[in-house]
Structure formats: structure tokens, C-alpha cells
Amino acid sequence: FFFSSRRRHTRYPLVTGVQTCALPIFRYTPDIIKLKGYQSVYQFVSTYLKHPNLRQAFSIQPLLVGGNPFNTTSIYALIHALEKKWGVFFAQGGTGEIVSQLKMLMERKGINIVLNSEIKKIITSKQRVEGIENSNGDFHKFDYLITNADPIYTNNVLIGNKKISLHNKLVNKLAKHSMGLFVLFFGTKVKYENIAHHTIWMGPRYKDLLSDIFDKHTLAEDFSIYLHRPTATDPNFAPANCDSFYALVPVPNLKGNILWDNEAPLFVKSIIKALEQTMMPKLAQTICDSFYMTPENFLQEYNTPYGSGFSIAPLFRQSAWFRTHNKDDLYQNLFYVGAGTHPGAGVPGVLNSAKVIDKLIPLYEK
């Protein structure tokens, strides 16, 4: 199993490298066929593992980047090789500290950061982006524009569907979006030392639950949870003798027309009850503070289409060159970073998209 995963890892440049044309896809096609890239991750895992619990444990990784293990290409099984070779890292201070350090780096480089200014429009002229217009109607001109907004939102709303390339029109029209996320953040006034930093809590169903989430867009009574306890590694996430957690639950995106104002409070109770009955005794009594995010929050705060948690799903037809390109096909000075472009979602994927941009921009400098 791990040998085959490592073989997929040898095609890592296809997944993370610079994609200026479709050539890498075609160059690697014989290898992809040989590695049975047409199989799903679950099919690949099932070739080697027979017990249903093991199949679940070794096939859930696509969910961490927004994909259904039953239709995500088995190329993504390379995640096993990546984690086995380099391990799993956690930044002291969490993702917020990564953002803080990037902000400090930008300031050291003389980059001016403007906050609380929503971009309403990208102004274009022929084959160039002239600048942006904010919510106050102010125009700002730029030589190059890098957008980390969702590419579909960038194209359909900020630029306008009639002013984008044919490739982006097809990506937008045919897009299969990732699932939504329900995230419950909570602190406890006691420590749960038995809980590891990362825990995956599996519900009674697997394939049928994923079908409810990805295909039927219905909110089921059962669920699975990724439980994150950063205090296991960084005690500064909570006061002394306290703990900090978030419980992340895959749910349907907003194509499901779920009334989250009604469902969210009930969903919170269900999550707490499930954890309390299995691994966190008296949890309801120990929670001292909590809040949650639903797909509605992702839509309103991050402008992600349908409130999806990871932009578009990592299907084969939405991977590498088939995603929105890092360099726009029509506008010579417009570039994309983030979960919706190449290589994809997750902190490693997003940071790799920035590395791709770092290599691309010099190719198009005046």
C-alpha cells in the first residue's frame, strides 16, 4: 500500500508544479493510467485493505481538501506518502500565527496592507487589469493583481462572466463544489488529557453519509467529526487547567437549502452529546465558551460559492491544469492564489499556490 502511495508521490510535480499549459497532464497520462489514477481513493485503498474500518481510516484524507473519497482520483493517495516522509506539523500559535508572520514579512518588504476595505470590482481594459474599485468607490491602479478570493467569485462577480476567458467560463459552469463545513469552537474549564491533538470520530455510516453530503445535499442525523485540540501541543491556546477545541463536521454546501438558523443550535447539541457519550465525559457541563460557523458564514464572510469549505472539489477533471489557472488566460497581469486554483485546498496547497505565483510573475514582467 505505502509503496504504491510513494509511486504516486513521484508524480507530485504534476499536482503542485507550475501549470502554464496542458502539456504536463498529457506527458504524465501514461503514468496516471499505469497507476490507475482513474480509480477513486476508496477503490485504491480497497485493493490493499479488506477490513471496512481500515478502508475508512486510509481513505478519508480527501475530505481534508474537500473531496469525496468515493470519487476523488486515487492520485491523492500520495497524501499518505507525504505524511509518512515529512510528518504532520503544527505552527505554535496556530494558523493565526502563520498569518501574523506573513503580515510581518510583507511589512518588512515594504508592502502596504489596507484592512476593512472590501473589493467590489476589478477594472479591466482589453487584455490587462487596470486596478480595483472598493466599496467606497475608490479606484486603485496596479501593475499586477494577485487575487486570493475564490476564483469563481473573482470571475463571476468582481470581473463579470462576459469578460473572462473560455477556460474560466467552462470551469465556472461545470464546477463541482466541495462540501460545506460546520465548525464548533469551544473551550472547557477542565483538561481532557486523553484527547490527542488530532482525532477523527467516525459515525455509523460512511459511504451513505458521504452521498447525503456530496450528492443529495441533505443534512443527516448522523455525522463524522474531526476534533482538533491545539492545547495538546501548544498550552497557550487556553488558560491554565483549561482546554481549547474545535469540532469540524462535513455537511452539505448551500445547494442543500438547509435553514442553518434553525438547524445549527440542534446540531451543536448533537455534536456535544456524541463526544460526551464516547470520549469526553460531562462535556456539556465543562464548556465555558463556544461559537460556531456554518456554510452561511463561509458564503457571507469569505464569498465562497455555495458556502463551500474548500472551493471546488479535487476531482480529476478539476485538478492541475483543469482548475482555474494561476495565471489568467486572458489578462496578462492577473494571477490567482488560494484553494480554488492550482494546486488546491488545505494550508500546504494554498502556500504552494503562492510559490507557483513566485515563479510565474517574473515570466510576465515588462
Give the residues covered by each predicted segment.
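A glycine-rich dinucleotide-binding beta-alpha-beta segment and adjacent secondary-structure elements
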Residues: 51-65, 220-228, 281-343
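Rossmann-like flavin
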Residues: 19-71
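Active-site-proximal substrate-binding core of FAD-dependent oxidoreductases
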Residues: 124, 363-366
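Single conserved hydrophobic/aromatic residue that forms the stacking wall/gate
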Residues: 1-21
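C-terminal segments that line or cap access tunnels to active or ligand-binding sites in enzymes
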Residues: 189-299
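Mid-domain catalytic core of redox enzymes
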Residues: 120-239
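Helical element adjacent to the flavin cofactor pocket in flavoenzyme catalytic cores
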Residues: 78-129
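A conserved FAD-binding loop/helix module that cradles the flavin
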Residues: 339-361
